Amino acid sequence: MSEPSEKKQKVATSSLEQLKKAGTHVVADSGDFEAISKYEPQDSTTNPSLILAASKLEKYARFIDAAVEYGRKHGKTDHEKIENAMDKILVEFGTQILKVVPGRVSTEVDARLSFDKKATVKKALHIIKLYKDAGVPKERVLIKIASTWEGIQAARELEVKHGIHCNMTLLFSFTQAVACAEANVTLISPFVGRIMDFYKALSGKDYTAETDPGVLSVKKIYSYYKRHGYATEVMAASFRNLDELKALAGIDNMTLPLNLLEQLYESTDPIENKLNSESAKEEGVEKVSFINDEPHFRYVLNEDQMATEKLSDGIRKFSADIEALYKLVEEKM
């Protein structure tokens, strides 16, 4: 009888449980839905890279096959059939994930549409329709969109006109974050680790959690949102280590890959609340605006070398994985 008791005690005092008690919703960043249940996350996020990786696992072959079969029956041209099958793959994985998590799943719009507002809206509506057909209400789905000018405007339309919740990804700058809040999007995913990667490569020096540029960027955004009363949730993403994570404990949401979830699960190191909305209201900068001024948004974003390069790089990488998924489906079609 002692073994179950010991296990229960470990889970109760794990760093993962402490993070949850600090007020942060823990989100699993993975398409491998069988692997995430162990950590009992509130939500789950996916992206083209994660879906591509999961699609190659033999245990999930049946979902790919089902999506390919769907594609064969929907579409006039081969291209349309493949595109429909790819959307169905996203929804197949999302639907399975929602059987594991009690909250929401984030499903990403094709990154190749990052500079096309109209096409992004159309794709998002199609994904939501596929979820509806699968019995999943739109309230449980976050549509992930790259935080380009066009992406933010697409999310604005989806939220206001269609009541579709959006998760703005590839967000590397304060400028992007301000525009997203003004667009009344449901949630943003500011990146931590990729920002640190850029400055580490540029300067050649290591950073502590206190000096980490990615951590400081997310703190600034969080404080700005709370100070000015924006309802948009902040979900820190792209972590490189536990120190970055600990420095942001208390933030609204945190999306974590399986390796970091496992480290938190196995660790009993203390995690204390570092962020809270009340203290954040005392910090931050004065209110600024970008949402209705495209030239100003583009200029300020362009002045930020890191954000410009990382946004571009992120879109290229996600697009490459979409192309790889396209070829995988094409071969099966």
UniProtKB/Swiss-Prot annotation:
Which keywords belong to this entry?
A: Pentose shunt, Schiff base, Transferase
Q: Which family does it belong to?
A: Belongs to the transaldolase family. Type 1 subfamily.
Q: Does the keyword Signal apply?
A: no
Gene3D superfamilies named in the record: Aldolase class I
NCBIfam families named among the record's database cross-references: talAB
- Name the chain's protein: Transaldolase NQM1
- State the species of origin: Saccharomyces cerevisiae (strain ATCC 204508 / S288c)
Q: Known EC number(s)?
A: 2.2.1.2
**Function recorded in the entry:** Transaldolase is important for the balance of metabolites in the pentose-phosphate pathway.
**Intrachain S-S bonds:** none
Active site (record annotation): 144 (schiff-base intermediate with substrate)
Reaction catalysed by this chain? D-sedoheptulose 7-phosphate + D-glyceraldehyde 3-phosphate = D-erythrose 4-phosphate + beta-D-fructose 6-phosphate
Q: Which residues form a coiled coil?
A: none
User: GO terms for CC?
Assistant: cytoplasm; nucleus
Could you say which enzyme class this protein belongs to? transferase
The answer to keyword Aminoacyl-tRNA synthetase applying to this record is no
Q: How does it assemble?
A: Homodimer.
Q: Which PROSITE patterns match?
A: TRANSALDOLASE_1 (PS01054), TRANSALDOLASE_2 (PS00958)
GO MF annotation, one: transaldolase activity
Looking up CDD domains in the UniProt record yields: Transaldolase_TalAB (cd00957)
The pathway to which it is assigned is: Carbohydrate degradation; pentose phosphate pathway; D-glyceraldehyde 3-phosphate and beta-D-fructose 6-phosphate from D-ribose 5-phosphate and D-xylulose 5-phosphate (non-oxidative stage): step 2/3
Q: Which GO terms describe its biological process?
A: carbohydrate metabolic process; cellular response to oxidative stress; pentose-phosphate shunt, non-oxidative branch
**Any additional notes?**
Present with 1920 molecules/cell in log phase SD medium.
Q: Fetch the InterPro entries from UniProt.
A: Aldolase_TIM (IPR013785), TAL/FSA (IPR001585), Transaldolase_1 (IPR004730), Transaldolase_AS (IPR018225)
